Amino acid sequence: MMLTRTVTAVALLVTTAVPALRADGNAPGFARGADVSWITQMESEGRKFYTPGDDRQEMECMQLLRDHCGVNSIRLRVWVNPKDGWNNIDDVVLKARRAENLGLRTMIDFHFSDTWADPGHQEMPEAWKNLSLDELTTAVGNHVTETLNALKNVGVTPEWVQVGNETTPGMMLPVGSVDNPGQLTRLNNAGYDAVKSVFPEAKVIVHLDGGNHQWAYDRMFDILENNGGKYDMIGMSIYPYWAEQQGETGGWTKVADDCIANINHLRQKYHKPVMVCEIGMPYDQGELCKQLITKMMGAEVEGIFYWEPQAPNGYNDGYNLGCFDNDAPTVALDAFKTK
C-alpha cells in the first residue's frame, strides 16, 4: 500500500505461448488472503473484532477472517528497524506463528526500509545509508536470512516471500533505482538467494503497484530479464481509488479490465505466474469491492490479498480502504467464500 503514485510512460509488447500456471479462484490452492500487519498494534490499542450480522460475537481477527470470510492466507510486512517496533522481526514472528497455528498460509513482505516502502517512498534503512554496494548487498541477504530463520525456528514456513514492496521505481533508492538496473538486479538477487537458502520451495515475488499500468511492469521485468534477475512470481497491487485520485476515468471496472489485460500480457511475455498482493476499495463500497474481487478471481492469478481489511475508517492518519465497518467484516470478502 502507498500514499503517492508517480506516472511515467513506456510500453513494450511481446506475445508468446504461456503455460497453465494458475489455480482456479474457487479451488483450495487459490490464495484468498489478507495482509493484517497492523493487527498487533491495533490489539495493543484495545481494538476488538466481531462476527458479522446481528448476533455479534467477539473473535480474534485472523480466526474471524478464516471462519467468516473464507481467508486461507496471511501476508505480513517486515521493516528493518522501525522506531516503534511494529513490523520488526519479533513482531512478524509473533503474527506468523498465530497464522500458522490457525492453519493459514503465509506471505512475507520485505520492505527493506525502517518504514513504509511504496512507489513514493523507497527509503534506505538508516543503518544502511552509508554502506557500499557490496556491503548493502550483504545487508539485504543477512536481513532476509535472519528474518526467515526466526520464522523457521518457530515452525513457520512461508509459501511466498516478496523481495521489496511496490518497487515500481526500484528499491532502497537511489542505489537500487530502475535507473541503475545492474545495481537493482544485484540487490534483488541478494534477497532471492537469501530466501532460497532458508526456504528453497518458497516462491519469490517482485511486487509493483498499479496493476493496470503495463508500462511499469514491462520496465521492471525487462530490467530483471536483461540483467540476470531472479524471481518466481509477479506481484501487483489493484486500487481503483488510487487510479481515480490520479485522474484515471472509467471506475473500478476499467481498472479491473486493464489489470486483467496486463496479467495476460505478463504471463505470455515472462512465463511467470501472477499474484494480486494487494487489493482494496473504500470501506463503504463493500458490494462493489466484492464484485471487483470476484472479477479478479476469474483472472489468471494465483491468489488475491486484501490489504489491512480489519482497519477501521480513518485508521493510521486516514486509511479508508479497509473492509470492516463497526469492527466487523462487510460483504467485500464474501467473494472469498468457496462455493
Per-segment meaning from a language model:
Residues 36-39, 79-81, 111-115, 163-168, ...:
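Active-site beta-loop-alpha junctions enriched in small/polar residues
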Residues 26-105, 111-140, 146, 162, ...:
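N-terminal substrate-binding region of glycoside hydrolase catalytic domains
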Residues 44-50, 254, 265-268, 283-339:
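Aromatic-rich peripheral "rim/lid" segments of glycoside hydrolase catalytic domains that contact
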